Amino acid sequence: MAMGAVALSVGVLAACSSGGSSTPSAGAAGPASTGPITIGASLSLHGGFSADGVAFQQGYELWAKDVNAHGGLLGRQVKLKILDDDSSPTQVVTNYQMLINSDHVDLTFGPFSSLLTAPASQVAARAGYAFVEGAGGAPSVFDTPANQADHNVFDVSLPVEDTIMPFVDYLGSLPVSARAHLSAAYPMAQDPFADPPVQLAKQKLQALGIRTDSSPAIANPFPEQPSSYGPAALAVAALHPEIVVLGSTDVPTVQEFMKVFAQKHYTPKMFIAAAGPDQGAAFTSAVGAGNAVGMMVPNGWFPLFNNAASKKMVDEYVQLHGGTKSGVNADVAEAYSVGQVAAQAIQATGGTDNTAIIKYLHSGVPLATVQGSVQFNSLGENGAAASFVFQWQRHKTGSQVDFVQVLPQGVAGTGSILATKPAWDTTGPAGG
C-alpha cells in the first residue's frame, strides 16, 4: 500500500507541475528525444468544406514532405496524424480531444474555417497547446474566453474583417457621379468567416452613397446549407443590383449564386465573394472558365506571388498533383505556411514544448512563409499580412483563364481590373 501511495503522489505532482492539464507534458519533448515529431490536425475531408479540407491536407503533407527531405526538424522526422471532421463543429472537438488526450501528439495544427477553428482552439487551450492555423481569421476565433485567457491561437493568414477593403477603396476612388447610380446587395451565409468583411463593406459603401438593395430573403444571413443558397440567389437576381458582395465560405455557395443568376439572365456589373473564387481549379472546373471571368475574391496570396519559397512550393505542387500554376488552391499555401511557422518556432525554442512555442510566437519576432511575412499581435492575428483582391481574367491567348491581382491599384504586381463582368455562358457548368 505504501508503494501505491507514493506512486499516486508522484503522478499528482507531475500533473500539478504542468498546470493541471489532462496532458501533463503539453507536447513537451525532453532533450534526448529522437523519435518523430507528431503533429495532429482535424480536416474536413467530407461534407461542405471538403474541397478546402482536401487542399489543406495537401498543403500540410507537402510541407512535411519538404521538411523530412531535408532531415526533419532538430534531426527528427515529422509525422502527421490527420482525422476527418466531416465539416462538423461537434466532430472537430472530438477529434482534437482524441489527438491530444489519446494520441498525445506533440503539436496541433488547425482545421479549415473559422466555424471549426473557434471550438477546436478551445480544446487545445485547455490542454496548454499552441494552436497554429491558417483558415480561422474571423474575429470570433480570437474573441473566445479561452484565447483571451491563454493566447494560444496563431493565424498565419490574413485577418478576415478588412479583406474586402481594397474593393471598397477602389469604388471610393471613382468620381461621385460614377457611383451615384450604383446599388449593391450583400447576401451572406451565416458564418463567422463570411459575415464580418461583408458587413464592413456594406457599412463603408453605404457611406460612399452606394444604395443598398435588399429584401426579406437576404436581410439577414441565410443558413449555411445548400437548400438556402437558391432562394437567396433568386432574391438578389430579382433586385438586379450593379454590385454583389457575397459572404461565402466555399465553392458550392458561389456556384449556386452564379447558376441562379445565369438562369435569370442577370449579370451583376461587379461580383466579389469572400471565398470560393480563390480555390483555383476547384472553382473554375465547377463554374466553367468562361463564367469565372470577372469574378473577384480577396486574399493574401496567389499562385504567381513573387516569393521564392512560394514559387518552389507551387512548382512542387503541380509536379505532384498536376494542373496549372494558376489552378493551385490558396488553401495549400495557407496550410504550408502553418507548417513553416511551426518549424521556425520548434527550431528557435529547441523542441516541442508548447509553452515555449506560445511565448516565442508572441515575442513579436518576424517569420517568413510562402504567403509572405508573419508577425503576431497579442491576440494571435497576423498583423504583417496585406490584403489584395484578385480577379479571374481571360488569358491573352487561348481559352485559359488567369488569376490576376487587381487591387489595390498602384501596388507592385497589380494588373488592370475588368470593371464590367461579361455575361454568363449559359452552356457552362454555372449556367446548367
Tell me what each language-model feature is:
Residues 29-61, 83-90, 112-113, 187-196, ...:
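Extracytoplasmic "Venus flytrap"
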Residues 90-94, 139, 150-264, 304-312:
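Extracellular/periplasmic Venus flytrap/periplasmic-binding protein
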Residues 18-28, 51-56, 71-146, 156, ...:
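Beta-alpha junction/loop-to-helix N-cap segments that form part of ligand/metal-binding clefts
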Residues 150, 260-336, 413, 419-431:
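Extracellular/periplasmic periplasmic-binding protein-like sensory domains
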Residues 190, 250-256, 305-364:
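Extracellular/periplasmic ligand-binding modules, especially the Venus flytrap/periplasmic-binding
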Residues 99-112, 131-134, 183-188, 240-250, ...:
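Periplasmic-binding protein-like
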Residues 37, 365-432:
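Solvent-exposed, acidic/polar segments of extracytosolic/periplasmic ligand-binding ectodomains
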Residues 11-15:
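C-terminal motif of bacterial Sec signal peptides marking the signal peptidase cleavage site
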